[in-house]
Amino acid sequence: TVLKELNSRTPLKDNSGNIVTPISWECSCMVRKCGACAMLINERPRLACSTFLHTLKGSTIILEPLSKFPLVRDLIIDRSILFENLKKLNLWLESEAYMNPWTHEPRYQSARCLMCGCCLEVCPNFSANGTFAGTVAAVNAFRILNEEQESTHLNEICLLYTSPSPRDTR
């Protein structure tokens, strides 16, 4: 995979043949479960742990950090905006949840979101400084709205998501 190759060559050299310091990147699970290794690989958002070199076209592989998030260093980005958006939108369970067996499959599919940011990288409406929280928030809202029982918190979330925004009233 791309992650296995990253920094495995010693010494690491740039295009001019100069020795460079190892590239900083994040990973945790190495098995497509955490999303920490999300990056642009040949200009496409992918998880580096599940991208195999033989599937990439061309003799050159270009690795870049996801561009919609603040850069920390090399291929490391700051995804904290994803968690801040969930806090701002009150997306958590506050009361006991009843799991309707008929909604198991959609809930399972929504729980597969790794919050890696790949979907937001290609979303024209998302920016780290913008008001649109993106798919990550929508997936979490779906889970909350389908699980939490009647409560003040649920009513507040429903009101938030069904009320027109100030932009919609123009």
Specify the residue positions occupied by each region the protein language model found:
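Signature of N-terminal electron-transfer/Fe-S-associated modules in redox systems
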Residues: 1-160
